[in-house]
Regions:
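Repeated scaffold domains used in trafficking and secretory/extracellular systems
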Residues: 81-91, 130-136, 172-182, 219-232
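A short beta-strand motif characteristic of beta-propeller blades
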Residues: 120-125, 161-169, 209-223
Length: 233
């Protein structure tokens, strides 16, 4: 529904709409779900009746804007676990990096590396809450992973075993990370986009040092209205 509840994958849940529906309608909708895709939070056991009532009342209130998260906050979260000069200068394991799968273990907060030939798990790495995606660098040496909590992990696949060498938190909520693959810039940069704040950050590809933050807030192309939450997915 979006951080500000103005609508995203799900419909808008702003007070002008939810107050019109009424408390009892909202409670039934939350508890039993809908054919259109709304989960049955109550009958599935995720929320009890008291929590359903609380949620129905909550979405009738004006949503507060979450705190901002800028370069200063990113730098405070940034951690280089293994400096570049202490990393291997050649591949130290026998993994076939040309035929290696990175599989998200979302609920467990981990990533499994699976050999493409044997289909066996060769390594499992802790990456944090609700891993969303992982992306290989252009050279195939590094693996970038990002969770929905906007924490980015940089994994060195040359190490034995593959290990996290740097990490950073780039926002409050995120879905995407990628590394530079353009000729001449291979592995040099990484970019992560966030749902909140609506922005993306360019990082050093070998250390995840945050270099530049670019906001995406602005006017819509058609009606020229200010959009406070253009999420970067």
């Amino acid at each position: 529904h979006g951080v500000l509840r103005k609508g995203a994958t799900g419909k808008a849940l702003t007070p002008d709409l939810t107050l019109e529906k009424g408390l009892e309608y909202l409670k039934v909708f939350i508890k039993f779900g809908s054919p259109g895709g709304m989960p049955n939070w109550g009958t599935s056991g995720v929320l009890n009746d008291e929590e359903v009532d609380l949620m129905a009342r909550y979405i009738q209130q004006t949503p507060p804007a979450p705190p901002e998260y800028g370069l200063k906050e990113m730098e405070a979260s940034w951690k280089v676990v293994v400096p570049v000069e202490q990393r291997p200068t050649k591949k130290m394991n026998d993994l076939d990096l040309e035929n290696l799968f990175s599989v998200t273990l979302r609920d467990d907060g981990k990533i499994a590396l699976i050999d493409g030939a044997s289909k066996k798990i060769v390594s499992i790495l802790e990456t944090g809450y609700a891993v969303h995606i992982s992306r290989m660098s252009a050279s195939g040496r590094y693996l970038f992973a990002i969770g929905r909590d906007a924490k980015v992990d940089l994994i060195d696949l040359w190490m034995d075993p593959p290990s996290t060498v740097a990490e950073i938190k780039v926002g409050a909520e995120a879905r995407s990370v990628e590394s530079s693959k353009f000729k001449g810039y291979e592995d040099k940069y990484a970019v992560a986009g966030t749902y909140w704040p609506p922005q993306f950050v360019i990082m050093d590809g070998a250390t995840l040092e945050p270099l530049k933050v670019v906001a995406t807030r602005g006017m819509t192309y058609d009606t020229q209205e200010y959009h406070p939450e253009p999420r970067v997915a």
